[in-house]
Regions:
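Alpha-mannosidase-like glycoside hydrolase catalytic domains involved in N-glycan trimming
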Residues: 17-112, 117-119
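Hydrophobic h-region of N-terminal signal peptides that target proteins for export
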Residues: 9-17
């Protein structure tokens, strides 16, 4: 059973402004770090001229934050994700706009282990895994 950790409301105001406004609320009494926020691409597509290559997420200070478009194995975008921290009972606002996306350093790494053609290893800043074939 999934517990609702973060609540997301996309305020579809694209027809009024060149941005979509998103409010993310932590409705729990627990601090949330690096919580992933997912917005269906069908909601993002309400933004005029948006493509997977030009969607940008801005915080309240108009600073661009890393985001990623999910395709889930297909050729059409399915969702937009980004991460944020949230204190207990805190709400944050973000804007989705079109623009030039910044390049961000990779935070995860994966590779096929050359010593064994059927092994795979991957890691990020919190965990590391190795799959033995």
């Amino acid at each position: 059973m999934k517990k609702p950790i973060m609540w997301v409301a996309a305020l579809l105001t694209a027809s009024c402004t060149p941005a979509l406004k998103v409010e993310v609320a932590n409705t729990t009494p627990t601090e949330r770090d690096d919580e992933t926020v997912e917005i269906a691409w069908s909601e993002v597509a309400a933004l005029k001229g948006v493509t997977p290559d030009n969607i940008v997420v801005l915080n309240d200070d108009n600073e661009q934050i890393p985001s990623q478009v999910l395709f889930r194995g297909g050729t059409e975008p399915q969702a937009l994700i980004f991460q944020t921290d949230a204190d207990p009972m805190e709400s944050k606002r973000f804007k989705l706009v079109t623009g030039q996306r910044e390049n961000y350093p990779a935070e995860a790494f994966g590779r096929t282990v050359p010593e064994r053609y059927d092994d795979y290893a991957w890691e990020n800043n919190k965990v590391a895994y190795r799959l033995y074939g």
